[in-house]
Amino acid sequence: MEAVGKHVKLFWNVYSDYAVLIAISLSYFVFDVLMLPFTRQFSLEDITISHPFALHEQVPTKYLGIICVFFPALVLYGFGKLRNNSLLFWKSLMGLLYSTMVCGLCVSLLKNAVGRPRPDFLARCQPFESTPKTGLVDVLSCSVPWSDKVLQDGFRSFPSGHTSFSFAGLGFLAIFLAGQLKMFRNKTSSWKVVVPLVPLSIASWIGLSRSQDYRHHKEDIAVGALFGFAIAYVVYRQLFPPLDHHNADILYVQAELDEGYTNVHSAGNSSATNAEQMV
């Protein structure tokens, strides 16, 4: 039994990160597809939800994974190859996936719980002509049936999923680049400051596009950006030292491995020296 316990512990130490990531990812996709939003009351006089419904979004959801996960993963792979360090790539990739999946799950739960109408909600709802123009009404005033996915999604405005996901993925990449390039070292080159701003600029553009498409209110976008970037930073700090650290580009686990190797190597040299002295 003791041997079995050791194997289970070893298995958990090695694969626990993968197991938790898979569980979070599955939960995210299940809740995102199956969970229904809270149907908040609204007013036909509310001009903030009276914008037209855009048939074509500037950044469709199907491209979000490519921009915010696949593209950053390629950059992480490039740094791993450049440094000849596969551990750097795999650990950073896990961080990227954790950042985006944790953010996606939390935002999905929050959006459905809050149930804030989108700026284009009335265009999705198409209220009956007999609906009172004053006062508050509910989803029963919509001529579009509740089973319609477009109407359901109209209650998922806060916070912005596109924006939070963008800053969770591209924000993680920006922090990673700042650390690898040691951006906060004294007398750093100006180009090292510009490079991390590129993914942040792309994430900001995605957030801005959600306002231009009338999918989100400005508060949804601002909170989504802060939330996504905060998760990215927290996840990053589980892997790397602070950005102003002299070894900001080295993984915690890498530093531990290198320190262990140094200690063993030093002990070996010390033993060899003692043996020579005895001879």
UniProtKB/Swiss-Prot annotation:
Its EC number is 3.6.1.75, 3.1.3.4. One of its GO terms (biological process) is phospholipid metabolic process. The chain crosses the membrane at residues 18-38, 59-79, 87-107, 164-184, 188-208, 221-241. Catalyzes the dephosphorylation of diacylglycerol phosphate (DGPP) to phosphatidate (PA) and the subsequent dephosphorylation of PA to diacylglycerol (DAG). It is found in: Vacuole membrane; Endoplasmic reticulum membrane. GO terms for cellular component: endoplasmic reticulum; endoplasmic reticulum membrane; fungal-type vacuole membrane; membrane. Coiled coil: none annotated. Residues 159-162 are annotated as: Phosphatase sequence motif II. Residues 209-220 are annotated as: Phosphatase sequence motif III. InterPro entries: P_Acid_Pase_2/haloperoxi_sf (IPR036938), P_Acid_Pase_2/haloperoxidase (IPR000326), PA_PP_rel (IPR043216). PANTHER family: LIPID PHOSPHATE PHOSPHATASE, RE23632P. Keywords: Endoplasmic reticulum, Hydrolase, Membrane, Transmembrane, Transmembrane helix, Vacuole. It comes from Schizosaccharomyces pombe (strain 972 / ATCC 24843). GO terms for molecular function: diacylglycerol diphosphate phosphatase activity; phosphatidate phosphatase activity. The gene is dpp1. Its main location: membrane. Residues 111-119 are annotated as: Phosphatase sequence motif I. The lineage of its organism: Eukaryota, Fungi, Dikarya, Ascomycota, Taphrinomycotina. Residues 1-17, 80-86, 185-187, 242-279 are lumenal. It catalyses: a 1,2-diacyl-sn-glycerol 3-diphosphate + H2O = a 1,2-diacyl-sn-glycero-3-phosphate + phosphate + H(+); a 1,2-diacyl-sn-glycero-3-phosphate + H2O = a 1,2-diacyl-sn-glycerol + phosphate. This is Probable diacylglycerol pyrophosphate phosphatase 1. Residues 39-58, 108-163, 209-220 are cytoplasmic. Belongs to the PA-phosphatase related phosphoesterase family.
